[in-house]
Amino acid sequence: MKEQEIQENMNKSIEATQRNFNTIRTGRANASLLDRISVEYYGAETPIKSLATISTVDSQTISIQPFDISCLQAIEKSISMSDLGITPNNDGKVIRINVPPLTEERRKEFCKLASKYAEEGKVALRNIRRDAVDKEKKDEKDGLISIDESRDNQSEIQKITNKFIALIETKLSEKEKEILKV
C-alpha cells in the first residue's frame, strides 16, 4: 500500500469516529444529535435531515420543521423511541426538543460511549496498519522489495498509525471535556 492510500483510509476512520462522537449528547442542543435517527416514511427508513429543516434555536432547544406536515407524527415518534432520552414537543407545524442538562450519571455513560467509539476507531486504524504491513511482507516474500525496504516501510506505517491514534485520543479527550462541562 502506498503511504498516501494508508493515510486516506485512516482519515476515513477518523471521520467515522468523529461522526460517532457528534451523535453523543453533551447537554447542549446540537442538530447532529438527530443524525442517526431514521423515520418510517412511505414504507422506507429515511433520515430526519432528509425530511425536515433542523436548527438550534438556543443552547437548549432544537427546532425541526418538516417539509411535509404529514410526516410530523412519524418524526415525533422516531425521536421519542430513540435512545437519546429527549421528549419532542409537537405544536402541529414544528417539533421542538428541549435538551435538558445531563445528570452526572448520564455524563459518565456518555463518556464511556465516547471511549467505546474511540476504541472502535483505533481498531479500524490497526486493521488498516495490519493490511499494509501484510502487503509489505508479501512484497518482500515475492522478492519485489528488499528486507531493508520492507522494514523501513513497516516502520513508516507504524509512525503513521501512531499519529492517527494520537489524533483519536485528542478528539476523545476534547469530547469528554465537552460532555463533562456543566
Curated annotation (Swiss-Prot):
Q: Which SUPFAM superfamilies match?
A: Ribosome recycling factor, RRF
Query: Mainly resides where?
Result: cytoplasm
Please give the Pfam families that the UniProt record associates with this protein.
RRF
Q: Which domain of life is it from?
A: Bacteria
Q: Which UniProt keywords apply?
A: Cytoplasm, Protein biosynthesis
List where in the cell it is found. Cytoplasm
Q: Does the keyword Transcription regulation apply?
A: no
Q: What is this protein called?
A: Ribosome-recycling factor
| Species name | Prochlorococcus marinus (strain MIT 9312)
